[in-house]
């Protein structure tokens, strides 16, 4: 028997969307002076909430607040997309401030030969601070600013906060700020090309474990968490390409550590994302230096992304330092310092920003890019789009000039629609009778499922996509109510209008800018504004300067998460668990 943890059971719980199956454990109290004189047993009793002690122990009626660590989340199969409820205390704006005040930051300077070197390494607590920011975060903050503030201008305001004198660098114990603030769009463009090659068998695909068709997007951590914990049969379908957050983290950690000759843990990477579940993604063992450590330099479990904060937490970060975020200048604070490698610098800080294409949606455009890649390979082909039961389910077909179907794909956003998707992918149960038909075959004949005919499905947990992520600023947040002068609590109509503002900000690139991406040249062949050849050359250069195989840098893996809750454990395992909790979880 194990108690089920829910909001009703705890007065300090943070209201998750689903019940967590971790049992509420109460650690044994420290023995008093009289008890300490008595022989001690090696047995300990874990008292579940609502249960009475089986021994003669007494309770004073007060129990410490229940705590659930990130380790608990990764070890059980209870929660799906409510990771924010248990991760706020582990990755937050307070952690950013704590690290910034821990020691003077490492500095990258030029030696007498003009080569980049790091100063300040004599202090073991010193870090080199670098941040990456998602376009959805910039869109959310731009909408909160109002006054036709663009996504790019909101990005400059974030740079002012993270690295400018009017922000974090203007105060604190050591006056530390972030050395670089990069745009995850550059990593996203690499992910788009890698994902298309994975689906269509293009030149960059080098993975040994190609996913099973239909290939499903894996850049949404809420969706991946749900699949690993509740529907492991879909794991062979998940794309092996890292998410933009993960790829950017690997790029920054590997390049800076290998080129500058410092340990990966001396580089501290902050990601600013629209989703609380990105905190969970950053904590995956597969996304640490254990996955890419090579060449006699084994990994030690150092995260590629050390901390994730959301769009909301950017405002909290500014407020905690007494900075009015909305009063920051809407221009770049300073020119970004030169990255230690010139080719990587050109990739991270392109001369021109590529405008977001509306046809690509608000979640990065994975499906749109793949379809454009298919169209580029078949002259005269065209797209046929069919809307599903709601706006978050759309099916696409690429038809040849003769009307023959060349490629089929779909988009599934929102948890309810995802449930329908995984239900269609569920394999039929084998019959226990010799020669009998598999269970479910009468209801779902083989080959009749439209979803199984798709080559690719773009899956996102949030309805409407990533601009509607759980970490985004919402219309009923006090900052929006104040800035919008709402007389009463916003309703569904205001929520819809607010989401439209965020989406509009996401697509608010300069109309005069060409649809070009990092390093694109007019002479290069472009797909959805991206040059695949330039991306491939950049990735090859990255692997070369770090001495790490490209497969280890750009691909990841997934595994079924099996719950141990309710299963018998040995005394040794129980003591180890208790010791871990007494020591603080992490």
Curated annotation (Swiss-Prot):
Q: Which residues form the signal peptide?
A: none
Q: Which InterPro entries match?
A: Cytosolic_Fe-S_CAF, Fe_hydrogenase, Fe_hydrogenase_lsu_C
**One GO BP annotation here?**
iron-sulfur cluster assembly
Q: Which residues form a coiled coil?
A: none
Family matches, as Pfam families: Fe_hyd_lg_C
Residues recorded as binding [4Fe-4S] cluster 1, renumbered to this chain, are 20, 73, 76, 79
Intrachain disulfide bonds: none
Q: Where does [4Fe-4S] cluster 2 bind?
A: 220, 275, 462, 466
SUPFAM superfamilies in the record, alphabetically? Fe-only hydrogenase
Q: Name one GO molecular function term.
A: metal ion binding
Q: Which domain of life is it from?
A: Eukaryota
Ordered alphabetically, the record's keywords are: 4Fe-4S, Iron, Iron-sulfur, Metal-binding
Q: Which family does it belong to?
A: Belongs to the NARF family.
Explain the purpose of this protein. Component of the cytosolic Fe/S protein assembly machinery. Required for maturation of extramitochondrial Fe/S proteins. May play a role in the transfer of pre-assembled Fe/S clusters to target apoproteins.
User: Which PANTHER family does UniProt cross-reference here?
Assistant: NITRATE, FORMATE, IRON DEHYDROGENASE
Name of the protein described by the UniProt record: Cytosolic Fe-S cluster assembly factor NAR1
Per the UniProt record, the source organism is: Chaetomium globosum (strain ATCC 6205 / CBS 148.51 / DSM 1962 / NBRC 6347 / NRRL 1970)
Gene encoding this chain?
A: NAR1
């Amino acid at each position: 028997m194990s108690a089920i943890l829910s909001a009703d059971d705890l007065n300090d719980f943070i209201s998750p969307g689903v019940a967590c199956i971790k049992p509420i454990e109460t650690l044994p109290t420290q023995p008093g002076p009289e008890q300490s004189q008595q022989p001690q047993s090696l047995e300990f009793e874990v008292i579940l909430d609502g249960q009475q002690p089986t021994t003669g122990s007494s309770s004073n009626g007060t129990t410490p607040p229940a705590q659930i660590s990130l380790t608990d989340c990764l070890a059980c199969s209870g929660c799906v997309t409510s990771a924010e409820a248990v991760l706020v205390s582990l990755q937050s704006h307070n952690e950013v401030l704590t690290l910034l005040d821990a020691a003077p930051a490492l500095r990258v300077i030029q030696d007498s030969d003009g080569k980049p070197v790091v100063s300040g390494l004599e202090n073991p607590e010193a870090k080199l601070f670098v941040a990456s920011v998602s376009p959805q975060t910039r869109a959310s903050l731009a909408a909160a600013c109002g006054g036709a503030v663009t996504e790019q201008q909101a990005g400059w305001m974030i740079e002012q906060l993270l690295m400018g004198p009017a922000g974090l660098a203007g105060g604190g114990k050591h006056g530390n700020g972030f050395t670089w603030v990069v745009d995850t769009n550059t990593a996203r463009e690499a992910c788009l090309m890698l994902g298309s090659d994975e689906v269509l068998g293009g030149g960059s695909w080098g993975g040994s474990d190609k996913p099973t068709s239909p290939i499903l997007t894996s850049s949404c951590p809420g969706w991946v968490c749900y699949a690993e914990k509740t529907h492991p049969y879909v794991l062979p379908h998940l794309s092996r390409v890292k998410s933009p957050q993960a790829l950017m983290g690997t790029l920054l950690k590997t390049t800076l550590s290998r080129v500058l000759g410092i340990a990966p843990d001396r580089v501290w990477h902050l990601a600013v994302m629209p989703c609380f579940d990105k905190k969970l993604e950053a904590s995956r063992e597969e996304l640490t230096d254990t996955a890419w450590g090579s060449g006699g330099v084994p990994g030690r479990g150092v995260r590629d992304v050390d901390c994730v904060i959301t769009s909301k937490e950017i405002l909290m970060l500014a407020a905690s330092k007494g900075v009015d975020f909305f009063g920051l200048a809407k221009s770049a604070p300073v020119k970004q310092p030169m990255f230690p490698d010139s080719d990587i610098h050109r990739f991270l800080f392109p001369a021109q920003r590529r405008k977001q294409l509306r046809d690509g949606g608000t979640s990065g455009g994975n499906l749109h890019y793949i379809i454009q890649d298919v169209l580029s390979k078949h002259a005269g082909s065209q797209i046929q789009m069919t809307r599903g039961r709601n706006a978050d389910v759309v099916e696409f077909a690429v038809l040849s000039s003769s009307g023959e179907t060349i490629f089929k794909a779909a988009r599934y956003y929102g948890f309810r629609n995802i449930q329908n998707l995984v239900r269609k992918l569920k394999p039929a149960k084998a019959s226990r009778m010799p020669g009998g038909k598999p269970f479910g075959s009468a209801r779902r004949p083989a080959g009749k499922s439209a979803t199984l005919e798709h080559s690719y499905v773009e899956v996102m947990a949030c309805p409407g996509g990533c601009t509607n992520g759980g970490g985004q600023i919402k219309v009923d947040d006090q900052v929006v109510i104040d800035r919008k002068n709402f007389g009463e609590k916003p309703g569904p109509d205001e929520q819809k209008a607010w989401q439209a503002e965020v989406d509009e900000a996401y697509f608010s690139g300069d109309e005069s800018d060409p649809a070009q991406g990092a390093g694109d040249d007019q002479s290069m062949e472009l797909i959805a504004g991206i040059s695949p050849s330039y991306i491939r050359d950049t990735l090859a250069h990255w692997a070369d300067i770090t001495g790490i195989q490209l497969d280890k840098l750009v691909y990841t893996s997934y595994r079924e998460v099996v719950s141990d809750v309710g299963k018998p454990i040995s005394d040794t395992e129980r003591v180890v668990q208790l010791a871990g909790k007494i020591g603080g979880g992490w």
